[in-house]
């Protein structure tokens, strides 16, 4: 579809939006405070005065609590989120200074589908969500844990994230679209992540989720709203993709119809039959008298069957005989001469040749043909007057035999005899019918066989699980021993009456046809279970269950360039540029791309007045020859810090800075745990209170205040009894396509877009499917003729994958 058409539709949506207005449909929003019935909740919350009096506000106290929704509320939330690409999470909060806590969380076990968190430890707002089944986190630096009232609204429109704080647009980002089809069993928590973690300390008011575009208007009605939203555009693109899918299906049907039409054009509309110069229409029937058959024209083909003759009940003075020009025998008077009975047309040689006609022997005169044989080979056929040579073909002249009988020559005559497997009808072998050997028990099929009647014969079929020995016998088939089975190599094959069965060996699971090794504790971080309780770990992990990360830095496995330092990551590592150096844009894993920052040329130094800036590797120096201007003072935040002055940063009470000879040096405050007035926020290692300890997310390990650890691709820290986690810092990659390998947390560069799991789709880069239909980048379709193969257009590349579970079920 041309882009100008997209813009036209976009304009129409925008115009319609302007006309309709932005009134909030109550069915498309959820008031969390009301749904959780906090008024009647006493443990851990108390109603207090809020930022305004239009709604109730609640203080979330610093004690264990369980503020979550009832099952029917969670089900309502599932329905509201289903297939939605636009929603806003908003609340009015007053958070205790320097604390961290979750404002709202929608979770299922360990998975945060939607979560809004405020960290006073790192002064940032975090949005946790799920994309394609994998956790994602957006960290937005902002200090909200300051004891002041704030209105926060986080809006998501497809891949567009917008954060408003106090009706000011703070951040706008492009993110991975979140999964909005929530699974059964999710739960909605307010003021906490779960029973023990993420406890919010402060007041929450107006907690809501709005399922409409620009939901922040509910909180800040005076804000301008844009038109259209990212989701509007996504809907248009999805509409185009749906049209492309419909076009592909219609193209396939059209191609099939054209093929059928082409075939029809090569044949007559009405199939006729031409026989002996006569034209018969479809379904016409006629009698082929020459061959005594009933024939029918069926779709241009002639089908003929032997004419069936009715049984004859001739009187005692008549006999059934064939009459020329007729297919069935008729009753005709018989003749008797000298005790011999003659049928109509039969002859007898006395003194003269006589023939039976109408019951009377009539004298006939017949010239016998000369014979080409010696006299001793002359024979007189039965009921004939002329002699023939021995070996004469009587069938060529003789009786008409039916389709299930055959003519047989004798010395002096020809007769009809039923074919094998047929029996004469009323004693007349010219007409024969099939013998059902199975029903008549005239077969020789042995045990473990089934008799199957066929025209003129029968067949002995083996029952399932048996194989043929000869035409009449079958024996049990050892499918397991012969290898003629479909059991997995890790399954036990057992012969059965019906064939065989497959059962997975101990330590393996599956249906017997497919068996996979089972590891009781699983294989973590992308490890593969290759044998019972045996894992093969991916690069970067070790342990019996791949549970241990290999610290490439501390174990000296790698060596970074001296301009960088080694930073360990789960399953991997990277060399991070040291202070005073930056990456040149090429990104080298070993840190060779780290080059010196020239603070002098960039004017990022702090040299004052007459002092000269001298660039050094990883830093700079201030050189002042002499004179009154060589004070060594340092410019700082629009002011001046004197040489030797020491101060604490306003935005970070745990850092202390000093000015020395024109250069500013900052460091973390030194901690003296012997000093009873030590700031435990800055020196958590000095906090020995049991209440300041933290349980990890799994509830298995206890950490002291100040301890750090890694969990689910996040760096976590225990501080005064509460756990605060933030995304691991990953290296900045300059490549077009990236992918996060199984078990790892940070992306790596890949050259093939089909391998990329984080890709920005360019709808201008289209793909051609197998029908020749152009597909937009990001489109997904099923491959023609292969229902288990799914294809996706990734910036001009068709990337297909096979669903092996689908193959097993089909």
From Swiss-Prot:
Amino-acid positions noted as binding Ca(2+) in the UniProt annotation, renumbered to this chain: 434-435, 437, 453-454, 457
Annotated keywords: Calcium, Cytoplasm, Differentiation, Disulfide bond, EGF-like domain, Glycoprotein, Nucleus, Repeat, Secreted, Signal
Record-annotated Laminin G-like domain positions: 64-227
Database matches in CDD domains: EGF_CA, LamG
SMART domains in alphabetical order: EGF, EGF_CA, LamG, TSPN, VWC, VWC_out
Location of the VWFC domain: 271-332, 692-750
Domain EGF-like span(s) in chain numbering: 434-475, 476-516, 517-547, 549-587, 596-631
Pfam hit, one: Laminin_G_2
GO BP of this protein: cell differentiation; negative regulation of osteoblast proliferation; negative regulation of protein catabolic process; nervous system development; positive regulation of bone mineralization; positive regulation of ossification; positive regulation of osteoblast differentiation; regulation of gene expression
Listed GO MF terms: calcium ion binding; heparin binding; protein kinase C binding
Keyword Calcium: yes
Location relative to the cell: Cytoplasm; Nucleus envelope; Secreted
Disulfide bonds: 395-407, 401-416, 418-432, 438-451, 445-460, 462-474, 480-493, 487-502, 504-515, 519-529, 523-535, 537-546, 553-566, 560-575, 577-594, 600-613, 607-622, 624-630
Phenotype upon changing residue 553 to F: In a colorectal cancer sample; somatic mutation
PROSITE patterns hit by this protein: ASX_HYDROXYL, EGF_1, EGF_2, EGF_3, EGF_CA, VWFC_1, VWFC_2
DNA repair found in the keyword field: no
Something else known: It has been demonstrated that ROBO3 binds to both NELL1 and NELL2. However, NELL1 is not expressed in the spinal cord at the time of commissural axon growth to the midline and has no significant effect on commissural axon repulsion in vitro, suggesting that NELL1 is not a functional ligand for ROBO3 in commissural axons. It remains possible, however, that NELL1 functions as a ligand for ROBO3 at another spatiotemporal location.
Subunit structure as annotated in this protein's UniProt entry: Homotrimer. Binds to PKC beta-1. Interacts with ATRAID; the interaction promotes osteoblast cell differentiation and mineralization. Interacts with ROBO3.
Function, as annotated: Plays a role in the control of cell growth and differentiation. Promotes osteoblast cell differentiation and terminal mineralization.
Protein name as catalogued: Protein kinase C-binding protein NELL1
